[in-house]
Each structure stands twice: as structure tokens, then as C-alpha cells.
Amino acid sequence: MNNLLTKLEQALGMSDTGSLNGLDYEFNPIPGDVEVVQVAIKDREELPIYLTQSDSQMICICYLWDDTEVIPAKRAEMMEVMLDMNIPMPLSSFGRIGQRYAIFGALSIDSSADDIARELTVLSDNALDAIEAMSEYLN
């Protein structure tokens, strides 16, 4: 867990909280076999970002909504819109993990602290934009 946490500390310049691009961050390691750090941004706490890594890449994931929140009659149209939105959001992509829709981005394991911080900010901004764009498909 320390390797990923150390990179976050370098990226945000603190031990467990800090500010970047006018946003205040807080992060917490999540216990388990896989190294995961939850990153919460002030005033966006309902959309935490989960950061994990493998031998070759880091993945940042932000869960957006649950499958039960999708209006059934609009599901197919929503999926089409999500596919269309992947192109204008080149640093983030839509996905689904179990019954939860998510937006995610990937970085090289060798990414700089600045790159990690930038990805967290971009992913958070894109998550807010995605929820706004998809609101007509959700209960």
C-alpha cells in the first residue's frame, strides 16, 4: 500500500489531505489484498475516486450510478450516448463493474506525481459532466 500512497503524497504534497487546482483532496488506503486508495475531493465526496495499480499501470475509477437508477425504457439510448461521449473525453472512459456504472482513466506506472494529480482532477470533472449529461436517463 505504501508505494501508491507515497505517490499520492508526492502528487498532492501532504500526508493525507491537500489542495490542487483549487480542489481540496483527502485520501485513505482501503485494507485488502489489492492496493487501493480512496481519494475524496471536498464538495464531491459522493463521487470518490479509487486508485489502484498493477505492475504496468495505474487505474483511477469513479463510480457514477447503480443499474437500478437507470430508467429501463431509456437504457439502450443511454448506452449509445455513453459510447458517443467516450471520444470527446479521451482521458476518461465509461465502464460497468457488476451493477455499477463507472468512469475510469489509466496511467503508466511511471507517471509523475503531477500526472497523477492531473488525472484525479480530470476524472472528477468528467464524472460530474457525465452525471449531468446522463441525468435524463436516470431516476
How would you name each of these model-derived features?
Residues 2-9, 13, 76-83, 131, ...:
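Generic detector of well-ordered alpha-helical segments enriched in charged/polar residues
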Residues 59-100:
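Short, internal acidic amphipathic alpha-helical interface segments
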